[in-house]
Structure formats: C-alpha cells, structure tokens
Amino acid sequence: MGIFHKLTFKTIQRRSGIMNDSLQNTDLISHFSHPF
C-alpha cells in the first residue's frame, strides 16, 4: 500500500509540477500526509 501511494504521489506531483499549481500541490501533500 505504501509503495503504491508513493508511485501515485510521484505521478500526481509530476503532473502538478507541469501545471505549476502550487496551491493544489500543497493540498495534495496535506491530504497524503494524513493516514487513511
């Protein structure tokens, strides 16, 4: 589960980086930081 989340986060981070959405990227980091 942890490896899958890391890969998903990397993909999302890459897409967010291309779009240059700092606010969305920060929101995603906060969301993924919390345990489900």
Swiss-Prot record:
Domain of life of the source: Bacteria
Function (record text): Required for translation of SpoIIID.
Put simply, this protein is called Protein usd
Q: Provide the taxonomic classification.
A: Bacteria, Bacillati, Bacillota, Bacilli, Bacillales
